[in-house]
Swiss-Prot record:
The gene is pri2. This is Class I hydrophobin pri2. Glycans are attached at N33, N40. One of its GO terms (molecular function) is structural constituent of cell wall. It comes from Cyclocybe aegerita. It comes from the Eukaryota. It is found in: Secreted; Secreted, Cell wall. GO terms for cellular component: extracellular region; fungal-type cell wall. Keywords: Cell wall, Disulfide bond, Glycoprotein, Secreted, Signal. It holds the Pfam family Hydrophobin.
Length: 123
């Protein structure tokens, strides 16, 4: 009886070591508060760029999308991403040859992305 209990106790670690390890396909996220984007270009929102952005994008957003004054609500320390497309860590993160950014859910069909922060993906 003692031999059966001992065998059962010794068998548990052996079975645990024999279990195959499943590799993780996801990596720790650097983009917790938005979406991961690959943008053709990005610009800071300093005074000169902000005036250009308000002129070009403000007119475009106001005229086409009915979102005039949107750039006044954007954090001045964040980036504006231009011509962005969403990427995923698993799928095509290494295919972004331009600027990889994390944008706070302000994507207008890839035209612009507001509230972005640059991130580095090394997979």
């Amino acid at each position: 009886m003692v031999a059966i209990k001992s065998l059962a106790i010794l068998a548990l670690p052996v079975m645990a070591m024999a279990s195959p390890l499943v590799p993780r396909t996801d990596s720790p996220s650097q983009c917790n508060n938005g979406s991961l984007q690959c943008c053709n270009s990005s610009m800071t929102q300093d005074r000169g760029n902000l005036q250009i952005a308000q002129g070009v994008l403000g007119g475009l957003l106001g005229g086409l999308l009915g979102l005039g004054g949107l750039l006044d609500l954007v954090d001045l320390n964040a980036l504006i991403g231009v011509q962005c497309s969403p990427i995923s860590i698993v799928g095509n993160a290494n295919t972004c040859t331009q600027q990889t950014v994390c944008c706070s859910n302000n994507n207008f069909n890839g035209l612009i992305a507001l509230g972005c922060t640059p991130i580095n993906i090394n997979l």
